[in-house]
C-alpha cells in the first residue's frame, strides 16, 4: 500500500506559488482575530491509475468519498475549530493507489481489501496586503497539513523506515511502529495516532526466515550486478589483448599521425594508452581490488545468509524477528524476538480487515504526522511552537476537541 500524494503535491505547489506572489506584492499582516470559514469540500481526487489499482467501480469510489464526507462532518463539529478565528479550513479527500509488492508472500489482491485513502485537513492563515493601492485579504498560503489516513496500514505510513540490509528490494516489511503513550486520549504509534478496534493487531510479526530472505535477495542482486560488471570488464580486456584489434588501433593511429608534426610520438602515446588500459582492466578483475574483489566479497556475504538460513530449524525460521543497527554482524542485527534493544519487524496484517463489510467501509484511521505539530517541548520545532492560530495550533485544537467516540462509531 502506498499513500497517493498527487493531490497533496498539486496543492503544495499552489500554496508556495501563492506565498511568493503575496510577498512580492507587499508587506502582509496576519489577522489572528478575524473570523474564518470552513470552505466547501474540494473535488475528490481519485485518479484513473488509483481506481484501476484498487479495482474500484465509480459507485464504490462514490461510496468511499461519502464515508470521508461523514468523517469531515464529525471533524467540523470539533469545538475548537468549528468557528475558525485567524484561519480558514480546507478539507479534501483522495483514493490511494495499490500495487502488488514483488516480495510480499500472501499479499491479497486489491479486490480482497477495502478501499483506502485519506482526508486532509488544512488550517490556512488569514492575512491582508496592499496591491495597487487596494487592500487584499486572503486565507491561503502555506500551512502544516493534518492527514487522516483510512484503511492504510502498510509500509511508509508511520513506520521508522527501511532496514539498510534489505537494500532496494521491493517488499512490504518494516520496523514496527512502537507505542509512545497517548495524545488527546488516542494511542500513539510511531508518528501516528491510531483509531482502530485493536491498534496492535494492524501488523503481524515478520518471521526470521522472511527477514533473512529479503537480505538474501538484496545480496543476490548485488552479486548479479557485480557479475555483469566483471563480465563486461573481462570482455573488454579480451578486446584490448587481441592482437588483431591492437594492430588495427596502431594502424589507425599511424594513419592519423601522418599529418602531425611528430607522428612517432603520437603512435607511442597510443601504445602507452593501450598498456595503461590493459593494466587498469587487469587490476579491476584482481581478487584483491576492484570488481573482482567486490564479487568475491559479495558472494561471501550471500553465502553468509544462505548458510545461516540452512542451519536454522523450522521453529527458528518461523520465530518473530527483530532488528538492531548496533548488532555489528548480520547475526547480531537480525534476531529472534523479543530481544533487548531489538526493534520488532512486521508486515501489514491484511487479515485485520473484515471482508464481509462493503469495500467502501472505513475500518481504521491513522492521524499523521504527530511530532511536527505536537512536539512543543522541542524549541527547534518552529512549526509546533508557531504563534499563528493556523497550521499546527489548529491541528492540535482539532485533535484535542474532536469527537473521538463519533469517529469510533463511524468505523466499522
Q: Model-derived features: where do they sit?
A:
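Boundary at the C-terminal end of the N-terminal hydrophobic targeting segment
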Residues: 24-28
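Acidic/histidine-rich, surface-exposed loop or edge segments in extracytoplasmic proteins
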Residues: 29-51, 363-387
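Bacterial N-terminal signal peptides
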Residues: 9-21
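Bacterial N-terminal signal peptides that target proteins for export
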Residues: 1-10
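Short, solvent-exposed recognition patches
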Residues: 48-361, 370
Amino acid at each position: 500500500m502506498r499513500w497517493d500524494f498527487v493531490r497533496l503535491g498539486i496543492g503544495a505547489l499552489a500554496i508556495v506559488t501563492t506565498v511568493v506572489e503575496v510577498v512580492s506584492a507587499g508587506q502582509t499582516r496576519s489577522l489572528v482575530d478575524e473570523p474564518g470559514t470552513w470552505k466547501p469540500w474540494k473535488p475528490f481526487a481519485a485518479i484513473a491509475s488509483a481506481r484501476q489499482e484498487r479495482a474500484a467501480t465509480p459507485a464504490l469510489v462514490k461510496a468511499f468519498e461519502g464515508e470521508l464526507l461523514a468523517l469531515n462532518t464529525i471533524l467540523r463539529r470539533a469545538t475548537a475549530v468549528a468557528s475558525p478565528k485567524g484561519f480558514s479550513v480546507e478539507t479534501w479527500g483522495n483514493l490511494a493507489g495499490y500495487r502488488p509488492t514483488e516480495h510480499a508472500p500472501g499479499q491479497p489482491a486489491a479486490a480482497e481489501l477495502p478501499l483506502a485513502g485519506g482526508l486532509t485537513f488544512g488550517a490556512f492563515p488569514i492575512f491582508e496586503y496592499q496591491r495597487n493601492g487596494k487592500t487584499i485579504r486572503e486565507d491561503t498560503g502555506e500551512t502544516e497539513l493534518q492527514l487522516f489516513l483510512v484503511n492504510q496500514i502498510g509500509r511508509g505510513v508511520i513506520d521508522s523506515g527501511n532496514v539498510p540490509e534489505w537494500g532496494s528490494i521491493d517488499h512490504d516489511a518494516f520496523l514496527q511502529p512502537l507505542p509512545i503513550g497517548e495524545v488527546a486520549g488516542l494511542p500513539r504509534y510511531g508518528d501516528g495516532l491510531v483509531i482502530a478496534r485493536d491498534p496492535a493487531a494492524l501488523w503481524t510479526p515478520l518471521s526470521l526466515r522472511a527477514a533473512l530472505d529479503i537480505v538474501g535477495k538484496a545480496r543476490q542482486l548485488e552479486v548479479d550486478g557485480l557479475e555483469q560488471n566483471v563480465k563486461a570488464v573481462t570482455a573488454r580486456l579480451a578486446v584490448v589483448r587481441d592482437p588483431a584489434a591492437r594492430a588495427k588501433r596502431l594502424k589507425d593511429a599511424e594513419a592519423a599521425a601522418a599529418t602531425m608534426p611528430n607522428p612517432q610520438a603520437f603512435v607511442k602515446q597510443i601504445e602507452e594508452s593501450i598498456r595503461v588500459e590493459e593494466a587498469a582492466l587487469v587490476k579491476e578483475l584482481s581478487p584483491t581490488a576492484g570488481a573482482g574483489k567486490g564479487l568475491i566479497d559479495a558472494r561471501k556475504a550471500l553465502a553468509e545468509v544462505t548458510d545461516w538460513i540452512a542451519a536454522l530449524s523450522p521453529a527458528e525460521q518461523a520465530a518473530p524477528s527483530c532488528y538492531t543497527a548496533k548488532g555489528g554482524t548480520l547475526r547480531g542485527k537480525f534476531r529472534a524476538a523479543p530481544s533487548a534493544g531489538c526493534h520488532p519487524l512486521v508486515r501489514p496484517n491484511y487479515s485485520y480487515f473484515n471482508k464481509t463489510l462493503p469495500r467502501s467501509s472505513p475500518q481504521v484511521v491513522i492521524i499523521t504526522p504527530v511530532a511536527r505539530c505536537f512536539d512543543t517541548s522541542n524549541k527547534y520545532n518552529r512549526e509546533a511552537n508557531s504563534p499563528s492560530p493556523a497550521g499546527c495550533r489548529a491541528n492540535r485544537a482539532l485533535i484535542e476537541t474532536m469527537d473521538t467516540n463519533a469517529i469510533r462509531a463511524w468505523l466499522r
